[in-house]
A protein has these predicted regions:
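Long, ordered, helix-rich scaffold segments
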Residues: 1-303
Length: 303
């Protein structure tokens, strides 16, 4: 099969499982055969699908450890080829951040050491880190709780003017697993003398995407809705907070909280977005419940 055909197969298996037409068995079989692929577009699709599988395992569980091992097996040979070899191929250049990010997730020692070394080389001026890898490297340093990195990046975020660098720092800061650090971001991002109000959404979005901090961010949204209304009411960003909740909430309790909270919000302009968010959460819950045992069995048999 050609590259386009392989991508279409992966995409089709994803959509069919998402909408309940089949389970993830075919997707897992396709992923299992993808470790040798070198095309950046296929690597990117495999990365996205394996990232989605993390929803099906509990944090810090044996199943998550097994999933990380599976992910490592898919990307390790590409890391060896691209990072330890010498290649200027544009396809490989585009694949580098994808591969590095997935191996950091997998807790691969060589990938983590690569991030540590690159960060230390440029600790005095992180803008000099390769821009294609910078977000991955900084996020790895924060996620792995390297001493002093979070505070350094937060102070830099408050002073730096470069938009691309600010976004990379924001992405890194929201990779934290420390709830006190998440609270610091949420509190600090409402101080308009320090940060533009619209930047608050970037922090919320990142913290909601992060499974370790999602509950903290969701709690903040519900308990600071008056601030959101005051700052963004009538603005195009207003419904973004509803969208990000619908995009990431993933438990039965969170669905109940979502429905109860937005039922009490009198905002006709948000009604359609609220309904779409509810439907997204319901569909996600069905997908999780249908496929959790399938992934668990796959990992037991394979690993």
């Amino acid at each position: 099969l050609g590259t386009i055909d392989k991508i279409e197969l992966l995409q089709e298996s994803f959509f069919l499982s998402q909408f309940g037409r089949c389970d993830i068995s075919q997707q897992l079989d396709l992923l299992s055969e993808a470790g040798h692929e070198t095309n950046q577009a296929i690597i990117g699709k495999v990365a996205g699908l394996t990232a989605g599988l993390d929803r099906l395992v509990n944090l810090n569980s044996d199943e998550q450890a097994a999933l990380r091992q599976f992910v490592s097996g898919l990307f390790k040979s590409q890391f060896t080829r691209i990072f330890q070899g010498h290649t200027d191929d544009i396809n490989d250049t585009k694949a580098r951040p994808i591969i590095l990010s997935r191996l950091v997730y997998a807790r691969d020692e060589q990938a983590i050491a690569y991030c540590d070394d690159l960060y230390q080389q440029h600790v005095a001026d992180i803008s000099q880190i390769d821009s294609n890898l910078r977000s991955v490297v900084l996020s790895a340093e924060v996620r792995l709780a390297r001493p002093g990195v979070f505070d350094q990046l937060w102070e830099l975020y408050l002073s730096v003017q470069d938009v691309e660098l600010r976004l990379d720092i924001c992405s890194a800061l929201t990779a934290t697993t420390d709830l006190s650090q998440a609270d610091k971001l949420l509190t600090g991002s409402t101080v308009t003398t320090l940060i533009r109000p619209q930047d608050n959404y970037y922090f919320i979005s990142g913290l909601m995407a992060n499974r370790y901090t999602r509950s903290t961010a969701w709690h903040w949204i519900r308990h600071n809705w008056s601030w959101i209304e005051e700052v963004f009411g009538g603005d195009m960003n207003y419904d973004s907070y509803v969208q990000v909740a619908g995009r990431h909430l993933s438990t039965d309790d969170q669905l109940v909280e979502y429905d109860n909270f937005f039922r009490g919000i009198n905002a006709p302009a948000l009604s359609r977005t609220i309904k779409l968010g509810h439907n997204d959460i319901v569909r996600r819950l069905r997908w999780i419940k249908r496929n959790q045992p399938i992934l668990a069995n796959f990992l037991r048999q394979r690993l």
